[in-house]
Amino acid sequence: MNPAHLLVLAAVCVSLLGAAIVPPQPLNLYQFNNMIQCANHGNRPTWHYAHYGCYCGKGGGGTAVDELDRCCQTHDNCYGEAEKLPKCSPYYKTYKYDCSEGKLTCKDAPGSCERSVCDCDRVAANCFAGAPYNNDNFFISFKENCQ
Protein backbone atom coordinates (compact mmCIF):
# COMPACT_ATOMS: atom_id res chain seq x y z
CA MET A 1 0.00 0.00 0.00
CA ASN A 2 1.21 3.51 -0.83
CA PRO A 3 2.66 5.37 2.22
CA ALA A 4 0.40 8.36 1.51
CA HIS A 5 -2.66 6.09 1.62
CA LEU A 6 -1.46 4.59 4.90
CA LEU A 7 -1.07 8.06 6.36
CA VAL A 8 -4.63 9.01 5.35
CA LEU A 9 -5.98 5.72 6.70
CA ALA A 10 -4.17 6.27 10.01
CA ALA A 11 -5.54 9.81 10.27
CA VAL A 12 -9.09 8.58 9.68
CA CYS A 13 -8.69 5.84 12.31
CA VAL A 14 -7.34 8.31 14.87
CA SER A 15 -10.21 10.70 14.10
CA LEU A 16 -12.78 7.95 14.56
CA LEU A 17 -11.16 6.84 17.80
CA GLY A 18 -11.26 10.40 19.09
CA ALA A 19 -14.90 10.78 18.07
CA ALA A 20 -15.80 7.59 19.93
CA ILE A 21 -14.60 8.98 23.27
CA VAL A 22 -16.19 12.43 22.95
CA PRO A 23 -19.39 12.54 25.01
CA PRO A 24 -22.57 13.27 23.06
CA GLN A 25 -23.59 16.90 22.92
CA PRO A 26 -26.95 17.83 24.40
CA LEU A 27 -29.39 17.66 21.50
CA ASN A 28 -32.08 19.46 23.43
CA LEU A 29 -29.99 22.63 23.70
CA TYR A 30 -30.29 23.08 19.94
CA GLN A 31 -34.08 22.98 20.27
CA PHE A 32 -34.01 25.29 23.30
CA ASN A 33 -31.89 27.75 21.30
CA ASN A 34 -34.47 27.71 18.50
CA MET A 35 -37.31 28.24 20.98
CA ILE A 36 -35.52 31.25 22.47
CA GLN A 37 -35.04 32.74 19.01
CA CYS A 38 -38.71 32.11 18.19
CA ALA A 39 -39.97 33.76 21.37
CA ASN A 40 -37.72 36.81 21.14
CA HIS A 41 -38.06 37.06 17.35
CA GLY A 42 -34.28 36.83 16.99
CA ASN A 43 -33.75 40.12 18.84
CA ARG A 44 -31.04 38.79 21.17
CA PRO A 45 -28.45 36.09 20.42
CA THR A 46 -28.91 33.00 22.57
CA TRP A 47 -25.31 33.09 23.80
CA HIS A 48 -26.20 36.29 25.72
CA TYR A 49 -28.09 34.04 28.13
CA ALA A 50 -25.30 31.47 28.60
CA HIS A 51 -23.40 33.30 31.37
CA TYR A 52 -26.01 35.63 32.77
CA GLY A 53 -26.61 36.12 36.47
CA CYS A 54 -26.40 33.24 38.94
CA TYR A 55 -28.53 30.66 37.10
CA CYS A 56 -28.29 31.16 33.33
CA GLY A 57 -25.83 28.64 31.91
CA LYS A 58 -24.36 25.53 33.47
CA GLY A 59 -25.13 25.09 37.15
CA GLY A 60 -26.51 27.79 39.35
CA GLY A 61 -26.96 28.79 42.94
CA GLY A 62 -27.52 31.56 45.41
CA THR A 63 -30.07 34.29 44.89
CA ALA A 64 -31.15 35.21 41.38
CA VAL A 65 -30.02 38.75 40.52
CA ASP A 66 -33.09 39.83 38.53
CA GLU A 67 -36.18 38.71 36.61
CA LEU A 68 -34.21 37.17 33.74
CA ASP A 69 -32.03 35.21 36.15
CA ARG A 70 -35.21 33.99 37.89
CA CYS A 71 -36.36 32.67 34.48
CA CYS A 72 -33.19 30.55 34.41
CA GLN A 73 -33.63 29.45 38.02
CA THR A 74 -37.19 28.33 37.24
CA HIS A 75 -35.91 26.50 34.13
CA ASP A 76 -33.27 24.70 36.21
CA ASN A 77 -35.93 23.66 38.74
CA CYS A 78 -38.22 22.52 35.93
CA TYR A 79 -35.49 20.29 34.50
CA GLY A 80 -34.98 18.91 38.01
CA GLU A 81 -38.65 17.91 38.12
CA ALA A 82 -38.48 16.40 34.61
CA GLU A 83 -35.51 14.26 35.70
CA LYS A 84 -37.83 12.53 38.17
CA LEU A 85 -39.76 11.00 35.26
CA PRO A 86 -38.63 7.51 34.15
CA LYS A 87 -35.60 7.62 31.84
CA CYS A 88 -35.92 11.38 31.40
CA SER A 89 -32.70 13.28 30.69
CA PRO A 90 -33.75 16.86 29.89
CA TYR A 91 -30.43 17.88 28.31
CA TYR A 92 -30.60 15.04 25.78
CA LYS A 93 -34.33 14.47 25.29
CA THR A 94 -35.68 15.90 22.04
CA TYR A 95 -39.30 16.85 21.56
CA LYS A 96 -41.80 18.04 18.96
CA TYR A 97 -42.91 21.67 18.91
CA ASP A 98 -44.10 24.39 16.57
CA CYS A 99 -43.10 28.03 16.35
CA SER A 100 -45.56 30.30 14.61
CA GLU A 101 -45.16 34.07 14.77
CA GLY A 102 -43.41 33.89 18.14
CA LYS A 103 -45.94 31.46 19.65
CA LEU A 104 -44.49 28.16 20.87
CA THR A 105 -46.60 25.01 21.06
CA CYS A 106 -45.41 21.67 22.47
CA LYS A 107 -46.72 18.69 20.50
CA ASP A 108 -45.81 15.57 22.51
CA ALA A 109 -48.29 13.75 24.75
CA PRO A 110 -49.02 15.49 28.05
CA GLY A 111 -47.25 13.77 30.94
CA SER A 112 -44.46 12.39 28.75
CA CYS A 113 -40.81 13.23 29.35
CA GLU A 114 -40.67 14.93 25.96
CA ARG A 115 -43.65 17.15 26.78
CA SER A 116 -42.28 18.01 30.22
CA VAL A 117 -38.91 19.07 28.80
CA CYS A 118 -40.60 20.99 25.98
CA ASP A 119 -42.82 22.81 28.47
CA CYS A 120 -39.76 23.73 30.57
CA ASP A 121 -38.06 25.19 27.49
CA ARG A 122 -41.22 26.90 26.19
CA VAL A 123 -41.93 28.62 29.51
CA ALA A 124 -38.28 29.69 29.84
CA ALA A 125 -38.09 31.02 26.27
CA ASN A 126 -41.25 33.09 26.80
CA CYS A 127 -39.92 34.29 30.16
CA PHE A 128 -36.62 35.36 28.54
CA ALA A 129 -38.52 37.26 25.85
CA GLY A 130 -40.48 39.22 28.46
CA ALA A 131 -37.68 39.94 30.94
CA PRO A 132 -35.42 42.99 30.79
CA TYR A 133 -31.76 42.30 29.99
CA ASN A 134 -29.17 44.02 32.19
CA ASN A 135 -25.71 43.99 30.59
CA ASP A 136 -24.17 44.38 34.08
CA ASN A 137 -25.37 40.86 34.93
CA PHE A 138 -23.60 39.20 31.98
CA PHE A 139 -20.51 37.25 33.10
CA ILE A 140 -20.75 38.33 36.73
CA SER A 141 -18.50 36.70 39.31
CA PHE A 142 -20.40 33.74 40.75
CA LYS A 143 -18.18 33.76 43.84
CA GLU A 144 -18.89 37.44 44.58
CA ASN A 145 -22.55 37.69 43.55
CA CYS A 146 -24.23 34.32 43.93
CA GLN A 147 -23.52 33.05 47.44
Curated annotation (Swiss-Prot):
Residues bound to Ca(2+) are 55, 57, 59, 76
InterPro entries, sorted? PLipase_A2 (IPR001211), PLipase_A2_Asp_AS (IPR033112), PLipase_A2_dom (IPR016090), PLipase_A2_dom_sf (IPR036444), PLipase_A2_His_AS (IPR033113)
> Does the keyword field hold Hydrolase?
yes
Organism (species): Bungarus flaviceps flaviceps (Red-headed krait)
Which Cys pairs are S-S linked? 38-99, 54-146, 56-72, 71-127, 78-120, 88-113, 106-118
Query: So what family is this one in?
Result: Belongs to the phospholipase A2 family. Group I subfamily. D49 sub-subfamily.
Named cofactor requirement(s)? Ca(2+)
Which enzyme class, named as a word? hydrolase
Which named protein is this? Answer: Acidic phospholipase A2 1
Give its localization.
Secreted
Annotated GO biological processes are: arachidonate secretion; lipid catabolic process; phospholipid metabolic process
Instruction: Briefly state the protein's biological role.
Output: PLA2 catalyzes the calcium-dependent hydrolysis of the 2-acyl groups in 3-sn-phosphoglycerides.
A single GO cellular-component term on record: extracellular region
Q: Which residues are catalytic?
A: 75, 121
Q: Which reaction does it catalyse?
A: a 1,2-diacyl-sn-glycero-3-phosphocholine + H2O = a 1-acyl-sn-glycero-3-phosphocholine + a fatty acid + H(+)
Keyword line: Calcium, Disulfide bond, Hydrolase, Lipid degradation, Lipid metabolism, Metal-binding, Secreted, Signal
Expression across tissues: Expressed by the venom gland.
Return the EC number: 3.1.1.4
Q: Which GO terms describe its molecular function?
A: calcium ion binding; calcium-dependent phospholipase A2 activity; phospholipid binding
